[in-house]
Amino acid sequence: MKSIMVKYTELPREETIYIGGMFPVGKVSAVVANGGVGKSWCVLLASLSITKGVRFLPNEEYPVWNDKDVMVIDTENRAKTFCERVILAGGSLERYYVPGEDICSAITYFDKRDKESIEEEIQDPNTMMVIVDSLAGFNGGIDENTVAASESIKWLGRLAQKYNKAVVLTHFLNKSEVTNRINTENMRGHSSCQQYMELIWAIDKDKGSEKIKRLYQIKNNITEIDDTVYRFKLTEASAEFLVTPTAEETSLKEKRAKIFEANIDKSDKEIAELILIEEPTSYLHNLVAWVKRRRKG
């Protein structure tokens, strides 16, 4: 059990640091996916970049440490599993702790005293990251469309900004696919909390393999999926990234480019509809976003 009382002093604000290349310090971010895809595992592996000095995302430039701490607010009754995974991944249990509880316990209900305890311990200068697994559990099982979820994001966001910590939420996405419409109301709640939610990562299964996952960065406007897609296999103790695009993916990009160039004078939606004929499993709003980015160069 870890309980450290320190006097808080304002930390210097420099260029944003991204833990594991994914999670900005001083902001709230999230990983969303369907059940069993690997949200918690993904967040844990990314956190090893500050507790063990192991890089997560490939081909990305970001600093690493091997002596920073991670606070785990576990609401899924899985802190013991999280503990086992830390060991499996070769991390140190001394670097992971649940506020006010043993690492193998779990907080299942948050009242005023729990939040006071969290704020006391988050001030520890060695704590760099706070994992909230999950957003729904943190709100007592309430989904993301409620005022309670919005208020929780704002509360966590204020802590992230005040104490310069990376706060990461996991959230079960109740959708047929991650790339389905993810609107502003779903993860950001009211507009007043948008200043705290920096970005969202989404994971889904690769259509060609049950073992391969796809990791997307969802842009700030929420409906736009980033072109950058990381494909990886979750192994027993790590993630094996597949940085080389498949022939099918390369061919798909070439087809899109040809359709765009041949119809450049048409509207964004018209071009997207032509691409949709070749990609019937895609979503029109994502294709429109792709055309807009293509026009900007």
Model-predicted segments: where are they?
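Short gly/ser/thr-rich secondary-structure transition/capping motifs
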Residues: 9-17, 112-113, 181-185
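Conserved, well-folded catalytic cores of nucleic-acid-processing
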Residues: 50-53, 89, 138, 176, ...
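C-terminal regions of RecA-like/P-loop NTPase motor modules
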Residues: 65, 123-126, 161-162, 207-297
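Phosphate-binding/switch region of NTP-binding enzymes
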Residues: 30-31, 36, 40-41, 63, ...
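A structural alpha-helix within SAM-dependent methyltransferase catalytic domains
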Residues: 44, 48, 119-122, 157, ...
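Conserved inter-motif catalytic segment of the P-loop NTP-binding fold
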Residues: 19, 63-147, 151
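The Walker A/P-loop phosphate-binding site
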Residues: 1-92
